[in-house]
């Protein structure tokens, strides 16, 4: 495999022709998603017409999914977010890495598998979990937990009954088999997601600080080793078709590719094999095979190696790749997205030990190539050179577009349609009926039907899990631990994408701090419609600007993330849906704060200000089908202060429960905390206050906490000294025959609340979880 490669095999006519009508018929680049300009750029880069294999490689690597060609100009501002002392690896690698102390580092990232999960819900969701787990593994970490932010069409829509059970079963089936607890996430229903469900997955892992891996292929003469499953035709076109194209009005892509097929057992042994390789220091570089398969792994590792300044390049023989189907062509082998595969760079001295270790684990390991100093990626197939390209042209130097932006034409009318004109409940009976209707609505009801299909406590390190505000994991015997939460609100972002992104970050931070953890890093998954629509791109630009601004003001680094475009059916895009994940840190997880009210007599305190804010609210949507107005105001300084008070109160042992207020307002939070802890609550609203606003407003920057009576004055002084509004709204009552009693308005027994809250999803999707 050494020496000067011959030119890739093409016909003399193809070599002579330049781009234009003469080559269009022979090279179907448009069908592969490339534009005329992009094709001409490829020809100019190579100085010739590309081979079929090269054309396939450029088509997937320059797809929206791989190249970020429409989003890159806006994502750059995330690099300006604070680089804290804890940040070890930021944007640019497979996942961000932060130092959490005690010689440990944590890596986490959220990605999407939206389009495959609509086509094949079970496999799409399962392989979405598998892919994000391998991203975490690639950094050198042991995966330890999963979160799954999900969005579906209307809860009673026929296709939701097809998609949701399959997605949930896929996540549970794959994650449970890997032995990974699913500790958090979201389930949201809205008709805009009917043809485009959002299946986002976050994984978190832990490792020794000194074991961080990189993807760079360096060291001339080092071996290129393919680990894991054999390569088949599953997933071919998954990137170039599914993640970079809209669905047609019939509910599917115009070109239907093969969705990847997952095997969690193979992934499990691959994880253990790779972790032992890392522990023994047997690899110099590592990359998972996900979107675009070998094409992406080979080009990214080679380009990363060259970027280090060391001599770099790679030669690969595809005949050595273990195949499931012997009839596959070169471009199919390169584009296959078969799951459970990794690419390792190994020194010649370590190669025998690597192969022996893989054999012991039952993992297929094959030396398929060599690191060179040619500066090029050369691929042979049946003895002929089919690829000879500069790897950076694929991995780093693809097209970058500054697409036109246009404020949505209907936005002013949408914002002017404020919910203030909607009929509001004014009597105690009407408030009672509204509360019962709200807590039974698809977006506010219990998620137990979903979460009970996941193993939330496997590995015995889960401290808190759904339905808590954040998932909490123990990292060491000392009590060191982390909290994770994901949040997003498409309705808020539809009304104001800048504020909507900031509200998503603010809520994720509140969830983490309500559990008692200090936020230290952010990841994001940006789900939007077609980038070819100027109105969608305006929404995207606004959301990026809002999120970057909020991260800077809160002092949080963005460690990485994902962009998912083309989430629309025909000309109808989804709501702009930035999903934000926040990582928090505990010194001692035994000091975590749950949401449940458990101690009779505890004072219930409301932190923050309540305003008449119902734009984009769950009340307006669930009771009136209304979307309009402006979302709640976001005050990032207040959010930061609230978080500091919640974390401080937790560490000082002043809180027995804490719950952030978001969708559904105070009423929803009280119901969830009462049911979680099995105790009632007696609430007294301020004299002369509007009971409806007090109970259902979605004002941001608020939380309800339970404080032992003996600590109430101390906690109130803590809030007063820092300038955080704090007022007592009630007390926790007994658990036997308890109720949620709002003085002067209504009382609802816990049993009635539980029946309303827990019955919706089983009724819609079946009793068997």
UniProtKB/Swiss-Prot annotation:
<keyword id="KW-0658">Purine biosynthesis</keyword>
<feature type="binding site">
    <location>
        <position position="562"/>
    </location>
    <ligand>
        <name>Mg(2+) 1</name>
    </ligand>
</feature>
<comment type="function">
    <text>Part of the phosphoribosylformylglycinamidine synthase complex involved in the purines biosynthetic pathway. Catalyzes the ATP-dependent conversion of formylglycinamide ribonucleotide (FGAR) and glutamine to yield formylglycinamidine ribonucleotide (FGAM) and glutamate. The FGAM synthase complex is composed of three subunits. PurQ produces an ammonia molecule by converting glutamine to glutamate. PurL transfers the ammonia molecule to FGAR to form FGAM in an ATP-dependent manner.</text>
</comment>
<comment type="pathway">
    <text>Purine metabolism; IMP biosynthesis via de novo pathway; 5-amino-1-(5-phospho-D-ribosyl)imidazole from N(2)-formyl-N(1)-(5-phospho-D-ribosyl)glycinamide: step 1/2.</text>
</comment>
<comment type="similarity">
    <text>Belongs to the FGAMS family.</text>
</comment>
<feature type="binding site">
    <location>
        <begin position="337"/>
        <end position="339"/>
    </location>
    <ligand>
        <name>substrate</name>
    </ligand>
</feature>
<dbReference type="InterPro" id="IPR041609">
    <property type="entry name" value="PurL_linker"/>
</dbReference>
<feature type="compositionally biased region" description="Polar residues">
    <location>
        <begin position="1"/>
        <end position="13"/>
    </location>
</feature>
<dbReference type="InterPro" id="IPR016188">
    <property type="entry name" value="PurM-like_N"/>
</dbReference>
<feature type="binding site">
    <location>
        <position position="135"/>
    </location>
    <ligand>
        <name>Mg(2+) 2</name>
    </ligand>
</feature>
<keyword id="KW-0479">Metal-binding</keyword>
<dbReference type="Pfam" id="PF02769">
    <property type="entry name" value="AIRS_C"/>
</dbReference>
<dbReference type="Pfam" id="PF18072">
    <property type="entry name" value="FGAR-AT_linker"/>
</dbReference>
<feature type="binding site">
    <location>
        <position position="68"/>
    </location>
    <ligand>
        <name>ATP</name>
    </ligand>
</feature>
<keyword id="KW-0963">Cytoplasm</keyword>
<feature type="binding site">
    <location>
        <begin position="112"/>
        <end position="115"/>
    </location>
    <ligand>
        <name>substrate</name>
    </ligand>
</feature>
<feature type="active site">
    <location>
        <position position="65"/>
    </location>
</feature>
<keyword id="KW-0460">Magnesium</keyword>
<keyword id="KW-0547">Nucleotide-binding</keyword>
<comment type="subunit">
    <text>Monomer. Part of the FGAM synthase complex composed of 1 PurL, 1 PurQ and 2 PurS subunits.</text>
</comment>
<feature type="binding site">
    <location>
        <position position="109"/>
    </location>
    <ligand>
        <name>ATP</name>
    </ligand>
</feature>
<dbReference type="Pfam" id="PF00586">
    <property type="entry name" value="AIRS"/>
</dbReference>
<feature type="binding site">
    <location>
        <position position="564"/>
    </location>
    <ligand>
        <name>substrate</name>
    </ligand>
</feature>
<keyword id="KW-0067">ATP-binding</keyword>
<feature type="binding site">
    <location>
        <position position="288"/>
    </location>
    <ligand>
        <name>Mg(2+) 2</name>
    </ligand>
</feature>
<keyword id="KW-0436">Ligase</keyword>
<feature type="binding site">
    <location>
        <position position="111"/>
    </location>
    <ligand>
        <name>Mg(2+) 1</name>
    </ligand>
</feature>
<dbReference type="InterPro" id="IPR010074">
    <property type="entry name" value="PRibForGlyAmidine_synth_PurL"/>
</dbReference>
<dbReference type="GO" id="GO:0005524">
    <property type="term" value="F:ATP binding"/>
</dbReference>
<protein>
    <recommendedName>
        <fullName>Phosphoribosylformylglycinamidine synthase subunit PurL</fullName>
        <ecNumber>6.3.5.3</ecNumber>
    </recommendedName>
</protein>
<feature type="binding site">
    <location>
        <position position="134"/>
    </location>
    <ligand>
        <name>substrate</name>
    </ligand>
</feature>
<feature type="binding site">
    <location>
        <position position="561"/>
    </location>
    <ligand>
        <name>ATP</name>
    </ligand>
</feature>
<feature type="region of interest" description="Disordered">
    <location>
        <begin position="1"/>
        <end position="30"/>
    </location>
</feature>
<dbReference type="GO" id="GO:0004642">
    <property type="term" value="F:phosphoribosylformylglycinamidine synthase activity"/>
</dbReference>
<dbReference type="GO" id="GO:0006189">
    <property type="term" value="P:'de novo' IMP biosynthetic process"/>
</dbReference>
<dbReference type="GO" id="GO:0005737">
    <property type="term" value="C:cytoplasm"/>
</dbReference>
<feature type="binding site">
    <location>
        <position position="260"/>
    </location>
    <ligand>
        <name>substrate</name>
    </ligand>
</feature>
<feature type="active site" description="Proton acceptor">
    <location>
        <position position="113"/>
    </location>
</feature>
<dbReference type="InterPro" id="IPR036676">
    <property type="entry name" value="PurM-like_C_sf"/>
</dbReference>
<feature type="binding site">
    <location>
        <position position="524"/>
    </location>
    <ligand>
        <name>ATP</name>
    </ligand>
</feature>
<dbReference type="GO" id="GO:0000287">
    <property type="term" value="F:magnesium ion binding"/>
</dbReference>
<dbReference type="InterPro" id="IPR010918">
    <property type="entry name" value="PurM-like_C_dom"/>
</dbReference>
């Amino acid at each position: 495999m050494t020496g000067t490669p011959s030119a890739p095999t093409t016909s003399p006519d193809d070599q002579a022709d330049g781009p234009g009508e003469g080559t269009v018929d022979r090279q179907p680049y448009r069908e592969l998603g490339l534009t005329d300009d992009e094709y001409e750029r490829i020809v100019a880069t190579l100085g010739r017409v590309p081979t079929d294999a090269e054309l396939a490689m450029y088509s997937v690597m320059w797809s929206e999914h791989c190249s970020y060609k429409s989003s890159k100009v806006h994502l750059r501002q995330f690099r300006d977010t604070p680089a804290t002392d804890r940040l070890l690896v930021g944007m640019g690698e497979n996942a961000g890495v932060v130092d959490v102390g005690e010689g440990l580092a944590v890596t986490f990232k959220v990605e999407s598998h939206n389009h495959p999960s609509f086509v094949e819900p079970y496999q799409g969701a399962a392989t979405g979990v598998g892919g994000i787990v391998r991203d975490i593994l690639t950094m050198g970490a042991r995966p330890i937990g999963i979160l799954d932010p999900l969005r579906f069409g209307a809860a009673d829509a026929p296709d939701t009954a097809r998609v949701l059970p399959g997605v949930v079963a896929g996540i549970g089936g794959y994650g449970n088999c890997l032995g990974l607890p699913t500790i958090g996430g979201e389930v949201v229903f809205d008709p805009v997601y009917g043809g485009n469900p959002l299946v986002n997955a976050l994984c978190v892992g832990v490792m020794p600080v000194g074991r961080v891996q990189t993807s760079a292929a360096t060291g001339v003469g080092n071996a290129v080793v393919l680990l894991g499953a054999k390569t088949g035709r599953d997933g071919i076109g998954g990137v170039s078709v599914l993640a970079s194209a809209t669905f047609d009005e019939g509910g599917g892509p115009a070109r239907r590719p093969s969705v990847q097929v997952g095997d969690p057992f193979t992934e499990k042994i691959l994880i253990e094999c790779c972790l032992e390789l890392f522990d023994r220091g047997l690899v110099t570089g590592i990359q998972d095979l996900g979107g675009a398969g070998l094409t992406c792994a080979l080009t990214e590792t080679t380009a990363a190696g060259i970027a280090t300044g060391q001599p770099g390049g790679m030669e690969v023989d595809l005949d050595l790749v273990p195949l499931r189907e012997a009839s596959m062509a070169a471009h199919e082998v390169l584009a296959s997205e078969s799951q459970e595969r990794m690419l390792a760079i190994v020194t010649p001295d370590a190669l025998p030990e690597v192969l022996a270790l893989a054999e012991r684990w039952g993992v297929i390991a094959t030396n398929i190539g060599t690191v060179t100093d040619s500066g090029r990626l050369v691929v042979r197939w049946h003895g002929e050179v089919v690829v000879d390209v500069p790897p950076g042209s694929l991995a780093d130097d693809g097209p970058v577009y500054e697409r036109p932006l246009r404020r949505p034409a209907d936005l002013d009318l949408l914002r002017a349609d404020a919910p203030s004109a909607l009929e509001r409940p004014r009597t105690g009976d009407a408030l009672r009926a509204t509360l019962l209707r709200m807590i039974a609505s698809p977006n506010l009801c219990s998620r137990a039907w979903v979460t009970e299909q996941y193993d939330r406590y496997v590995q015995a390190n889960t401290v808190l899990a759904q339905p808590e505000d954040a998932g909490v994991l123990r990292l060491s015997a000392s009590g060191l631990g982390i909290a994770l939460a994901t949040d997003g609100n498409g309705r808020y972002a539809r009304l104001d994408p800048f504020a909507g992104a900031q509200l998503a970050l603010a809520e994720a931070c509140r969830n983490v701090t309500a559990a008692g953890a200090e936020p230290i890093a952010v990841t994001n998954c940006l789900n939007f419609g077609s980038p070819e629509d100027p109105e969608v791109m305006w929404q995207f630009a606004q959301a990026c600007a809002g999120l970057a601004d909020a991260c800077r003001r809160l002092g949080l680094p963005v460690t990485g993330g994902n962009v998912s475009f083309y989430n629309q059916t025909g000309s109808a895009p989804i709501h702009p849906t930035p999903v934000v994940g926040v990582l928090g840190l505990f010194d001692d997880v035994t000091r975590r704060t749950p949401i449940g009210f458990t101690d009779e007599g505890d004072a219930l305190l409301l932190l923050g200000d309540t305003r008449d804010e119902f734009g984009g609210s769950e009340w307006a949507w669930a009771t009136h089908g209304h979307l309009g107005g402006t979302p709640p105001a976001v005050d990032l300084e207040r959010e930061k202060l609230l978080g500091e008070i919640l974390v401080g109160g937790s560490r000082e042992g002043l809180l027995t429960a804490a719950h952030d207020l978001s969708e559904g307002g105070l009423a929803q939070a009280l119901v969830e905390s009462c049911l979680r802890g099995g105790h009632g609550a007696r609430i007294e609203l301020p004299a002369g206050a509007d009971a409806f606003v007090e109970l259902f407003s979605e004002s941001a920057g608020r939380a309800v906490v339970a404080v032992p009576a003996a600590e109430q004055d101390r906690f109130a002084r803590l809030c007063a000294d820092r300038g955080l509004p704090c007022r007592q709204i009630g007390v926790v009552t007994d658990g036997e025959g308890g109720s949620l009693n709002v003085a002067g308005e209504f009382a609802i027994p816990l049993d009635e609340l539980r029946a309303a809250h827990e019955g919706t999803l089983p009724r819609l999707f079946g009793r068997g979880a």
